[in-house]
């Protein structure tokens, strides 16, 4: 199906236009669960509602012959409207799901009518035929419910028809019908979902400069050729053979955080939509764990450092001998002082080295590359600063970075000269 929509632009565009009307309504995510639990969605006996209808109609007709019977008609109207309101309040959510049931069926009908369902055209037609007139059975009830929220007139008509209990009877009939057609409906839902996913992936692939389908192997490694970040315009691609735990160092804004995010994104894309933004991508299947873009939480009283500690602990608790864990960490323990950060980071990374995991860490701490030399491989990004400009090539190089650019950036951004001079002196003293 994916190949079909990659190659056939016209059916893809038609299907996209139809699927837009389906939208991203939150209730759609719960439709399969609703259909699987229809037994709990019955609103009562149709016979009971029919009896109340007959009593109301009988009292009205009788009142035309004998005025003394009219009060009974009023009582029955009050009883019916009370039954309607209480039942509707109790089952409002379930009744609203019926509107989404119809929406999915209508989407399937439009896809088949426009002949843009590709490889699943026949399957959709068969499922729609099996479902029969379910959409018409529900359609009028759904339209009336929508109108009841749109105007005062709609509210009045809702209560007027509520007296007849027509909506409750229609809903109960729909539930019983859907129970008998449960499998057909769920298969229709799944096929439309697969079609939607295939179009999304095909459209994503068309938007990329180039892509590849991943290759999975049994080696504990990830091989990336000319890989890039999919959200960057005119991205710079890099290659890497990642078979050992590694530390990525680099100056500010040199590209290390973007690189590790690109790695994480492609690891996820490879195992979900079989698409990688690279010339070639090989990997061992595994769970992906990240600690990046950490933020404090004022409402919960959690500092940046505490949040990061929770992220890292979650990683450590996920390790198992049965499944490889691939960990990607941006600026490890950034939220604490330098001395303790380096000590704690080394201890954590030493522990990870002994586990069934593959680790990539981005860090400003050159000291870590020295302390972990021999156990962690080193890569870096760098830059070139002139008198009036700064140039980043965003290329990944082997080895650890040997210099920073923070003080150079102070000068480049035209900070007062005395600040730049003092910063240089302080660095010299510490070295």
Language-model features: locations:
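Alpha-helical coupling/stalk and coiled-coil linker elements that connect catalytic or binding modules
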Residues: 1-251, 259-260, 264-287, 310
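ATPase nucleotide-binding head domains, primarily ABC-like/P-loop NTPase cores
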Residues: 65, 201-431
């Amino acid at each position: 199906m994916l190949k079909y929509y990659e190659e056939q632009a016209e059916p893809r565009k038609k299907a996209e236009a139809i699927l837009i009307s389906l939208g991203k309504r939150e209730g759609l995510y719960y439709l399969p669960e609703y259909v699987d639990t229809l037994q709990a969605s019955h609103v009562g006996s149709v016979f009971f509602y029919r009896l109340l209808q007959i009593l109301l109609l009988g009292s009205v007709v009788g009142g035309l012959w004998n005025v003394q019977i009219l009060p009974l008609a009023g009582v029955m109207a009050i009883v019916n409207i009370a039954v309607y309101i209480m039942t509707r309040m109790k089952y409002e959510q379930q009744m609203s799901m019926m509107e989404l049931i119809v929406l999915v069926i209508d989407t399937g009908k439009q896809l088949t009518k426009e002949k843009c369902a590709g490889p699943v055209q026949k399957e959709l037609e068969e499922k729609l035929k099996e479902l029969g007139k379910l959409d018409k059975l529900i359609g009028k009830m759904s339209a009336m419910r929508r109108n009841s929220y749109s105007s005062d007139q709609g509210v009045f008509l809702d209560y007027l028809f509520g007296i007849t209990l027509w909506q409750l009877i229609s809903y109960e009939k729909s539930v019983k019908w859907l129970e008998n057609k449960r499998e057909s409906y769920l298969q229709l839902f799944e096929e439309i979902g697969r079609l939607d996913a295939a179009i999304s992936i095909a459209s994503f692939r068309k938007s990329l400069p180039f892509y590849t389908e991943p290759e999975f192997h049994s080696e504990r490694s990830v091989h990336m050729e000319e890989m890039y970040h999919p959200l960057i315009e005119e991205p710079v691609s890099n290659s890497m053979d990642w078979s050992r735990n590694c530390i990525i160092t680099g100056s500010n804004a040199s590209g290390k955080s973007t690189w590790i995010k690109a790695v994480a994104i492609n690891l996820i894309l490879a195992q979900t939509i079989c698409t990688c933004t690279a010339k070639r991508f090989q990997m061992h299947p595994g769970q992906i764990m990240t600690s990046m873009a950490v933020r404090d939480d004022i409402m919960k009283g959690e500092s940046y450092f505490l949040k990061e500690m929770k992220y890292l602990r979650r990683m450590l608790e996920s390790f198992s001998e049965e499944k490889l864990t691939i960990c990607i960490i941006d600026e490890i323990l950034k939220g604490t002082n330098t001395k303790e950060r380096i000590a704690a980071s080394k201890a954590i990374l030493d522990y990870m080295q002994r586990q069934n995991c593959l680790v990539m860490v981005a860090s400003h701490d050159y000291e870590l590359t020295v302390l972990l030399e021999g156990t962690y491989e080193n890569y870096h990004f760098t830059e070139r600063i002139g008198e009036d400009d700064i140039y980043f090539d965003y290329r990944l190089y082997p080895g650890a970075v040997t210099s920073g650019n923070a003080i150079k950036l102070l000068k480049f951004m035209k900070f007062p000269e005395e600040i730049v001079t003092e910063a240089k002196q302080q660095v010299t003293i510490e070295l």
